[in-house]
Swiss-Prot record:
Protein name in the entry: Cysteine-rich protein 2-binding protein
GO molecular function: histone acetyltransferase activity; LIM domain binding
Compositionally skewed regions (Basic and acidic residues) per UniProt: 256-276, 405-426, 446-459
Tissue expression pattern: Expressed in skeletal muscle, heart, lung, placenta, brain, liver, pancreas and kidney. High expression in skeletal muscle and heart. Lower expression in lung.
Source taxon at top rank: Eukaryota
PROSITE patterns assigned to the protein according to its UniProt record, in alphabetical order: GNAT
Ranges of compositional bias, category Low complexity: 315-335
GO cellular-component term (any): nucleoplasm
Subunit structure and binding partners: Interacts with the LIM 1 domain of CSRP2. Component of the ADA2A-containing complex (ATAC), composed of CSRP2BP, KAT2A, TADA2L, TADA3L, ZZ3, MBIP, WDR5, YEATS2, CCDC101 and DR1. In the complex, it probably interacts directly with KAT2A, MBIP and WDR5.
Stored PANTHER family: CYSTEINE AND GLYCINE-RICH PROTEIN 2 BINDING PROTEIN, CYSTEINE-RICH PROTEIN 2-BINDING PROTEIN
Amino acid sequence: MDSSIHLSSLISRHDDEATRTSTSEGLEEGEVEGETLLIVESEDQASVDLSHDQSGDSLNSDEGDVSWMEEQLSYFCDKCQKWIPASQLREQLSYLKGDNFFRFTCSDCSADGKEQYERLKLTWQQVVMLAMYNLSLEGSGRQGYFRWKEDICAFIEKHWTFLLGNRKKTSTWWSTVAGCLSVGSPMYFRSGAQEFGEPGWWKLVHNKPPTMKPEGEKLSASTLKIKAASKPTLDPIITVEGLRKRASRNPVESAMELKEKRSRTQEAKDIRRAQKEAAGFLDRSTSSTPVKFISRGRRPDVILEKGEVIDFSSLSSSDRTPLTSPSPSPSLDFSAPGTPASHSATPSLLSEADLIPDVMPPQALFHDDDEMEGDGVIDPGMEYVPPPAGSVASGPVVGVRKKVRGPEQIKQEVESEEEKPDRMDIDSEDTDSNTSLQTRAREKRKPQLEKDTKPKEPRYTPVSIYEEKLLLKRLEACPGAVAMTPEARRLKRKLIVRQAKRDRGLPLFDLDQVVNAALLLVDGIYGAKEGGISRLPAGQATYRTTCQDFRILDRYQTSLPSRKGFRHQTTKFLYRLVGSEDMAVDQSIVSPYTSRILKPYIRRDYETKPPKLQLLSQIRSHLHRSDPHWTPEPDAPLDYCYVRPNHIPTINSMCQEFFWPGIDLSECLQYPDFSVVVLYKKVIIAFGFMVPDVKYNEAYISFLFVHPEWRRAGIATFMIYHLIQTCMGKDVTLHVSASNPAMLLYQKFGFKTEEYVLDFYDKYYPLESTECKHAFFLRLRR
């Protein structure tokens, strides 16, 4: 009895879902317009209903509803056709919440009196929904969103055998997961690209697992369509009045409505004709818009600059006839949310009240059709993504809204034979009032189109240092072709000379800078206006990268001379020896990045004795080896502190000596709380730097170095620990050379290898360098 009640409640629930949809033609079986009912057939003829109630708030789904699971989760017995609640089972079939995808036989129906179950073959969409639901119950993620590869794919891989059995794990199975997320958006999955500013974040629209629907309860598509026709959807879509809609209405009602529209149109035409005969004049004293009069009795042509607004208070009643545009008062379209509104159009049907605007019309009414980006209707089948702020000024707006087309380009709906003659009469009468406006719009677009069709002059950019290295490598790889071409030999020698000058710290000849300097001497205005291009002064960075090849290390690269051991000429030997003469090292500083007060020291270590200190201690004690009363002085501590401006020259010198030329870490002064510098007295022996917030949930360790004479004392271990603690809750990433033994140290902290990058350091090392140029990309997941 209880099972039959439960069965009827499930059927009624499907009936309610079906009645919220609208009828449609040509849909596949199991698909209802407005709400896709995804029914996936499995091998055992069982099906799964992945539809959810669309009436809830799809923006809020943080944690799974455990109480809902306790009430709804049950298993369907194939023999007795009953639903058995999970609480009545003798053993737990699945350790995952919301998982009842089993071919189940209850203990009453089985021959041995034991419950029998067998895993059904799951589809990828079911697996993804189960994974995301269980992740939400764990409370992980960010605002209910989960990362596609790091969270969802990792969960599926962890439970692969339990969910997918012996299904073969292909090399691109994670791409299948990404495809399921994209295809199921926005019906089942919602992207977090808007909230976090980066792709790869997803969550369930309704945080409930997919429900299993056995074959006995499956409703036919025809039944769903019949029930859906009796109740329209309650999600209205605002459309523009005047657009024709498909509707199955009584022919008598259609004829009456057509007659009423025709009378309204005739009334509007009479009013316009009367206004043309009694055309007023334009008050020039209060209007700032230039007006050009063509002839008496004709509407003045209002000439507008882009972004200018007409002042309607300065226009007479004769000038208040609206342009050919939809009525400002929209009408509600109660069509199905899954059906795009019909884009066929009819002439503007205006009444006398519509001729006098109550408020200022939209600015888009006074621009050409090519400049208008939206038609006022958002396709409900798409998920609206607002364009980035920077794209507004740089180019056309890109979104899901469709471009407005001219009246002559809009596809007309097929009309009946009775409507055609009347329709042609209306069109012919409205054509006279629209022809002049369309002609002026075409004339205005012609010079703009001619201007746009002109080929743009090429804009040349200087070759970067890395591109010069690649070009020189290519020339050296084909000596035969270079020997036969004088131009190639000349280019090769020029590149070699430029490289030699960089190694020796000599200035390079730059024609653009010479011409720019000459123009600045003649007149500063010419230099500022020349081409609208701001040239970089000598010494600025020339390491350009595309978005695909962007590297965080590029921000520290400069065009300084690359000779090994080269140092700033302003750096004194005393500063390089003892760091600085700054006596105010014991004062706190304020971080410009987080506005936190940073103490003078992170840690003062009196216990660690690196090999360098042990050697110094032995040298001092050797002098007093014959003095039994000699007591050694206490050693100075190792001071861990935040980076300061006086540290930068020495750190840059060490980076250029032990890493590669052209490194300048001055940018790290903008976020000193994500740095650590180790001092012995005033000598810098180690340092580490991290770039915070390279992504929404990720930080990047850019440089970590300990002087070779101070290693194997735990200094690097504490620096890594400190940098990790500064970004609690965020992933920490880094690149490490493939031949660097420090990889073992990173693995102790939980860093995992994600990628092996070939020739990662080839961009930075000199050509003659023998260092390993490949790198591992490591990530510490939090």
